[in-house]
Curated annotation (Swiss-Prot):
InterPro entries: Ccdc124/Oxs1 (IPR010422), Ccdc124/Oxs1_C (IPR054414)
Biological function: Ribosome-binding protein involved in ribosome hibernation: associates with translationally inactive ribosomes and stabilizes the nonrotated conformation of the 80S ribosome, thereby promoting ribosome preservation and storage.
Pfam families: Ccdc124 (PF06244)
Keyword Cell membrane: no
Keywords: Coiled coil, Cytoplasm, Cytoskeleton
Gene encoding the protein: ccdc124
Protein name, UniProt field: Coiled-coil domain-containing protein 124
Predominant subcellular localization, coarse grouping: cytoplasm
């Protein structure tokens, strides 16, 4: 039986070995590509997930920053309003206090004037009920006062001693007229007006004395 050719078998084995090696390399390359693709896909998912997480955190921080900024602006505006009110407050209070003080002073002044006018020359006092002092002559009217002053030589030298009775009669006689002429005047102002008229009135004993002196 003839022998087989050994060299041919060696070449065939080498070819098969090379083929197997090439296949193994190709399979390894393919496997690597598959693994790389898998890792790449996983990386993309991770990156997207991280990006979404980062975006969410960024939006949260931005919202928090806007909230803080709005709070700061609100506090700043509130502080300005309070500061403005603090500056205006004392001024209003001061004006109110000044007006109240002036009104109080005016009221006190009017009360004092009324008390003084009533004490000096009581308008409501009825001279007909005044009890004459000892050593004096009672005069119920202006004519009586003038008659007393004119008939008493010693008293005529000092007519000011009978001024009060004469003025009281003058005031009672002329107060209604002055009130009618000056309806808006207070009692103290009416009395001042009468006093001015009294200084020039011929019914004033002092004026009568001066007139009598001038005729001599």
């Amino acid at each position: 039986m003839p022998k087989k050719f050994q060299g041919e078998n060696s070449k065939s084995a080498t070819a098969r070995a090379r083929k197997a090696e090439a296949k193994a390399v190709a399979d390894a390359r393919k496997q690597k590509e598959l693994e790389d693709a898998l890792w790449e896909d996983n990386d993309k998912r991770v990156v997207k997930k991280e990006q979404r997480k980062d975006d969410k955190e960024r939006k949260r921080l931005e919202a928090l920053e806007r909230k803080r900024e709005n709070q700061r602006l609100l506090e700043e505006e509130d502080s300005k309003i309070k500061g403005k009110q603090t500056k205006e407050g004392p001024s209003k209070v001061t004006r109110a206090q000044i007006e109240e003080t002036l009104q109080s002073k005016q009221n006190v002044k009017e009360i004092k004037e009324k008390e003084k006018s009533h004490l000096d020359v009581p308008l409501e006092e009825n001279v007909n009920r005044i009890v004459p002092e000892e050593g004096t002559v009672e005069a119920r009217t202006i004519e009586d006062a003038i008659a007393v002053l004119s008939t008493k030589e010693d008293l005529d030298r000092h007519p000011e001693r009978r001024m009060k009775a004469a003025y009281t009669a003058f005031e009672e006689a002329n107060m209604p007229r002055v009130k009618m002429e000056n309806p808006n005047m207070r009692l103290s102002q009416l009395k001042q007006q009468l006093k001015k008229e009294w200084t020039k009135s011929p019914e004033n004993p002092l004026n009568q004395r001066a007139a009598s002196y001038n005729t001599k």
